[in-house]
């Protein structure tokens, strides 16, 4: 039984290409048409470059004459640039109480605005203690006021709902 060669990441190069004919693009970007694989390999060796399979799923597969080391480096660079540009959306939490004072409320609003500017979602948790549970309407009104105050910069993702002793609302930036 023959050992199975491990699957290699990336495109096939030079002798790894096992097709009789390929669509060839030379090092200048000129389309040479359908060429026998031996001729394509000879052209690549004469140029001192590699024959790289660019599009294996087309018929015939598209191969290009280029410097494979440089090609790999540029692909890695593109991938790392794409990873840098991605931002992971976090869910930040703001905790309130039904009897919150106006200044405390304004401070919480400022930090919420900062979270929205950074592109994060905000989970607003309104916690009820003891007899405050009897006055859930106060908490609901507070969350409605908060919703109106951030309407310009955020939208409601999850409406206020009661879970045990706390009311939760999730907001996301516009």
From Swiss-Prot:
Signal peptide: none
Keyword Protein biosynthesis among record annotations: yes
Residue intervals passing through the bilayer: none
InterPro entries (UniProt xref): T_IF-3_C_sf, T_IF-3_N_sf, Translation_initiation_fac3_CS, Translation_initiation_fac_3, Translation_initiation_fac_3_C, Translation_initiation_fac_3_N
Gene3D superfamilies noted in UniProt: Translation initiation factor 3 (IF-3), C-terminal domain, Translation initiation factor 3 (IF-3), N-terminal domain
Main subcellular location of this protein, as a coarse class: cytoplasm
Annotated localization: Cytoplasm
MF GO annotations: ribosome binding; translation initiation factor activity
GO terms under cellular component: cytosol; membrane
UniProt keywords, alphabetically: Cytoplasm, Initiation factor, Protein biosynthesis
GO BP terms: ribosome disassembly
Presence of the UniProt keyword Protein biosynthesis in the record: yes
Annotated S-S bridges: none
Known role: IF-3 binds to the 30S ribosomal subunit and shifts the equilibrium between 70S ribosomes and their 50S and 30S subunits in favor of the free subunits, thus enhancing the availability of 30S subunits on which protein synthesis initiation begins.
Complex and partners: Monomer.
PANTHER family from the UniProt entry: TRANSLATION INITIATION FACTOR IF-3, TRANSLATION INITIATION FACTOR IF-3, MITOCHONDRIAL
Protein family per UniProt: Belongs to the IF-3 family.
The protein's name in its UniProt record: Translation initiation factor IF-3
Native organism: Xanthobacter autotrophicus (strain ATCC BAA-1158 / Py2)
């Amino acid at each position: 039984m023959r050992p199975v060669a491990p699957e290699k990441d990336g495109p096939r190069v030079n002798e790894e290409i096992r097709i009789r004919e390929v669509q060839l693009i030379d090092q200048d970007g000129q389309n040479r048409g359908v060429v026998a694989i031996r001729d394509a390999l000879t052209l690549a060796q004469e140029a001192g470059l590699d024959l790289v399979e660019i599009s294996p799923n087309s018929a015939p597969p598209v191969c290009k004459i280029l410097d494979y080391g440089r090609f790999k480096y540029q692909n890695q660079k593109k991938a790392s640039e794409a990873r840098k540009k991605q931002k992971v959306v976090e869910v930040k939490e703001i905790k309130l109480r039904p009897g919150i004072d106006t200044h405390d409320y304004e401070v919480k609003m400022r930090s919420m605005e900062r979270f929205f500017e950074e592109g994060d979602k905000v989970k607003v948790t309104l916690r009820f203690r003891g007899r405050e549970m009897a006055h859930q309407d106060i908490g609901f009104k507070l969350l409605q006021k908060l919703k109106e105050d951030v309407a310009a910069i955020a939208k409601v993702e999850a409406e206020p709902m009661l879970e045990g002793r706390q009311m939760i609302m999730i907001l996301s930036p516009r």
